[in-house]
Swiss-Prot record:
The chain crosses the membrane at residues 15-35. F(1)F(0) ATP synthase produces ATP from ADP in the presence of a proton or sodium gradient. F-type ATPases consist of two structural domains, F(1) containing the extramembraneous catalytic core and F(0) containing the membrane proton channel, linked together by a central stalk and a peripheral stalk. During catalysis, ATP synthesis in the catalytic domain of F(1) is coupled via a rotary mechanism of the central stalk subunits to proton translocation. CDD domains: ATP-synt_Fo_b. Pfam families: ATP-synt_B. It is found in: Cell membrane. InterPro entries: ATP_synth_B-like_membr_sf, ATP_synth_b/b'su_bac/chlpt, ATP_synth_F0_bsu_bac, ATP_synthase_B_chain. This is ATP synthase subunit b. It is a single-pass membrane protein. HAMAP family: ATP_synth_b_bprime. Keywords: ATP synthesis, Cell membrane, CF(0), Hydrogen ion transport, Ion transport, Membrane, Transmembrane, Transmembrane helix, Transport.
Amino acid sequence: MILVQLAAEEAQNPLIPEVPELVIGLLAFAIVFFVLGKKLLPNINKVLEERRAAIEGGIEEAEAMKVEAQSVLEQYKAQLAEARHEAARLRQEAQEQGATLITEMRAEGQRQREEIIAAGHAQLEADRKAAAQALRQDVGTLATDLAGKLVGESLEDHARQSRVIDRFLDGLEEKAEATR
């Protein structure tokens, strides 16, 4: 009999379950599906929604930070350009001041040179006059001594000596100036 039962059981298709098993399986599936749908699925959806909101919030925050960073970069570039313009302006002013200072110093040097040259000419003229006066006296004394030796008399009258010597030297100077 066991053999007959085994043979009868073998004839049944193993892919088609028996009705009571099928009903129990469907009932168990419906219970599990209901529990998962009512309890677990809302929690999963809630976590997924929070995650999506966090990601979107992070993206929005990143966009806001990007816009802010771009704004700061533009401000930095504007400040840098302004600083460059200011540096160029200061450099130009310094060059202009330097050129003005050089011009003033050259003018001052020229003025001092002219003063030194004028003082030198005045000193030379004073020295020439002093030398001419000393030379007149020495020439006059020598001429008087020589004339006295030639004539054999003493020519000690100073007033007359001075007049004769001055007339003679003035005549020499006039001849020298006429030949120039």
